[in-house]
Amino acid sequence: GVIILGIVWGLWHIPDDLVCYTQTSGIQMIFAQQITCISLGIFFAYAYMKTQNIWVPVCLHYLNNNLIPIISGTFSADVLENQTVSWKDLPVALVLNGLCFGFFLLADVFKKKEVQEEE
């Protein structure tokens, strides 16, 4: 379910990918966004399931969206616009995101709970 959530979330970002983030490498950006959204979806779901507090993933999402402008000191959309993503960047993004976030899928909160039948 978490993977499907990440895919849907990535699809929801397609207009931003094509209009705001890049106008030269749209298809690559869509694939990169899918990798990012699936990875962050796993982590955000873990954070929610661990805390049972919707504000935790909301705050994490806010930090994710705003850390680059804060760290760069460029408080403008320019820091996020006109990105270039090449096909060779995608395997690197997949491996790095997989290493950073994939192991959360092994957490107890994602394990299927057995339902005991009443006799």
Give the positions of each predicted feature.
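Membrane-interface interhelical connector segments
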Residues: D17-I27
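Small-residue packing motifs within transmembrane alpha-helices
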Residues: V2, G6, Q33, C37, ...
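C-terminal membrane module of polytopic membrane proteins
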Residues: Y62-E119
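Membrane-water interface at transmembrane helix exits
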Residues: W12, D16, Y48-Q52, D108
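Membrane-interface helix/loop boundary segments of multi-pass membrane proteins
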Residues: G1-V8, C20-Y21, Y46-N53
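Functionally important transmembrane alpha-helices
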Residues: I27-W87
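Residue-level recognition of pore/gate-forming positions within transmembrane alpha-helices
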Residues: G6-G10, Y62-N65
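Alpha-helical transmembrane segments of multipass membrane proteins
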Residues: W12-D16, L40, F44, I68, ...
